[in-house]
Every structure is written in C-alpha cells, then in structure tokens.
A protein has these predicted regions:
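Conserved active-site and cofactor/substrate-binding residues in soluble primary-metabolism enzymes
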Residues: 23, 50, 61, 223, ...
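Loop-centered beta-sheet repeat module
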Residues: 91-142
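Thr-Gly-centered strand-to-loop micro-motif
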Residues: 212-213, 238-240
Length: 306
C-alpha cells in the first residue's frame, strides 16, 4: 500500500505493517495503529484546484497518465476529466474575495486552515496550500486513487463563502453550463483540442454504480478488482464507502454487472464532430456535496464559526 491507502486505513483503526531501511542499511520493522501516532498534520502544498481539464487520446496506442485511472485507449475511445464544476470553492470565489490565508474550512471532515496559494498557483489556474489535523479527519473523505502512473491521494474540501457584498453573491450564481472545461490531448496535456463545459460532464448522470451480483460470472481474474482505482470492489462485493464514482466498472466489466450512466459528450476535434463516452472521473461530486452539507449544518448550529 502507498500514500492515501495507508492514510485511510490508519484512520479506520486498522493495523499497518511498517518496514523502513536506514541510511546505514539497517532494517526496522514494526506494526502500528493510529494510536501509535502522537501527532499527525497534513499539509498539502497544491490542493483544491479551480476545476481542471478533460483528456482524450487521439493516437492509436493506449497511453499511461496520472489523468486516467488506467491506460487511456486510443482513437477517441473515451474521455477522462477532473473537477466538480459549480461545487468547486475557487470557482465560486474567482477573485479570492473571501478565500484567503487563514480562512477556516473543512478538510476531510476536520477543521483546517488555508495557508495561502499553492505551488504553481496562478490567476488562471489557482490552487491552495491547506492544512488540518490528520487524526481528526474522517476516513470516508480521503484515500488512495490508482492512476496509470502510480498512486495519488484524494481529499475532500468544503470552504464557506460568506456573502458580504454583491460581487461575492454574483460569483456564487455560476452554474455548470457556464464553466468551461478545456479539452486536451492526454499525451501532450498542454495542447488544447477544444472545450466543453461541466454541465456536459455531470448533469443527469449517475454518481454511483449499481452492482448486480446475479450478473457476476465470478471470473478467475476479475478485471474490476484489478482496475478499480480505490480498491472498492473485491470478493464480489462493492464497498460504497470506498467507491469514488469514477465509472470504470460500468465500462469495463465483461458481464455488465455494474449499471451506471456516466454519459457521453459531443465534441469538435480537429474539425471533426465526434461523440465520446465519459469513462473516468477523477473528482467525486458525491463526497463534495456531503462535506458541503456537513459544513452548512455546522454553521447553522454555530459549531463552526466563520
């Protein structure tokens, strides 16, 4: 296990086997739980991006990338994207009227603070540097996510935006259809191919799959167990506390045991009109909504002070 998978299981109270090697070559092995950690603080230097980009592969061969949970097949066979659209905090406060150094928010369920702009942040593509007490976090909101080039850590952020003036209010009115989503070639992610919007990615589509056990053929080698980026499916069981709603299972199960409408999108690429299925999400709107509603309730009960 690496990264987010370890962080999640420690918070769940599970036992972790640790093996480290010193610079002198000495090996130290131990078994630990969260109780063995005196203090834990997560400091994310580049987090909470203002939405992101969609990717396709126009080449023939599959391409490994951090922007796809599995190698993305060629010939425009599928689209992968990141960003929760109009739920994104920075998208709702584009000029940083409210979200500033010292802003309090919920970071995986724990009270956190904005330390400032994240590394490589810019006016066009802002992100944040965030921190919170790791031991106070809810394991549901963070974990590991496997990509075509290794593991990543996913986190969930909910930032309050008090309406202090008309400009802040107007910024909050933005909706998915008005948020542009750049489309890029996954092999050269800075090469634009066109654009779409977040309404095309999210509106009317399912946030979680339905698993039909009766359709499962108990394959000797289960494709979904192998490719699920959060290890949410094993032993013919779908663990919804781990499911990220990425949609891969619905597209790659050989027996169609998973039912999930992740949608498709009409695009213009290099002068051609094409329809491409959305096969992989790297953002989870369900978790984002849950944490936002949790923050709202804490504010209403005055358990969270702005």
């Amino acid at each position: 296990m690496v990264g987010g998978f370890v962080l999640k299981e420690l918070l769940e109270g599970k036992t972790i086997d640790v093996r480290v090697e010193s610079v002198e070559g000495k090996t130290i092995e131990n078994t630990i739980t969260i109780e063995d950690i005196g203090r834990g603080q997560i400091i994310g230097t580049r987090m909470a991006f203002k939405n992101y980009t969609a990717f396709v592969n126009t080449y023939k061969e599959p391409i490994n990338s951090i922007f796809s949970a599995i190698p993305l097949e060629g010939n425009l066979s599928g689209l992968t994207f990141s960003g929760c659209g109009d739920l994104n905090p920075l998208q709702n406060d584009i000029p940083h009227n409210v979200i500033k150094t010292g802003t309090r928010f919920l970071f995986n369920g724990a009270e956190g603070y904005v330390l400032g702009d994240g590394t490589r942040s810019s006016a066009e593509k802002p992100n944040l540097m965030l921190t919170a007490d790791y031991k106070q976090m809810d394991p549901y909101y963070l974990g590991g996510y496997k990509t075509g080039q290794g593991g990543e850590v996913y986190d969930t952020v909910a930032i309050p935006i008090p309406v202090l003036n008309e400009e802040i209010y107007n910024n909050l009115l933005i909706t998915d259809e008005n948020i542009k989503l750049p489309l890029a070639e996954i092999k050269g992610r800075h090469l634009p191919l066109g654009e779409t919007n977040y309404k095309e990615m999210w509106e009317g589509y399912d946030l979680r799959p339905q698993y039909g056990r009766s359709k499962c053929s108990k394959c000797d080698s289960c494709t979904i167990e192998e490719i699920c980026p959060t290890n949410a499916f094993s032993n013919e069981r779908l663990d919804l506390t781990r499911c990220f709603g990425c949609g891969l299972c619905a597209h790659f199960c050989k027996n169609d045991a998973f039912d999930m409408n992740t949608g498709d999108v009409d695009l213009e690429i290099k002068g051609n009109q094409v329809n491409v299925p959305i096969i992989c999400r790297q953002s989870d709107r369900l978790r984002g909504n849950k944490l936002s509603n949790q923050l709202k309730k804490l504010i209403e009960t005055q358990e969270f002070t702005l």
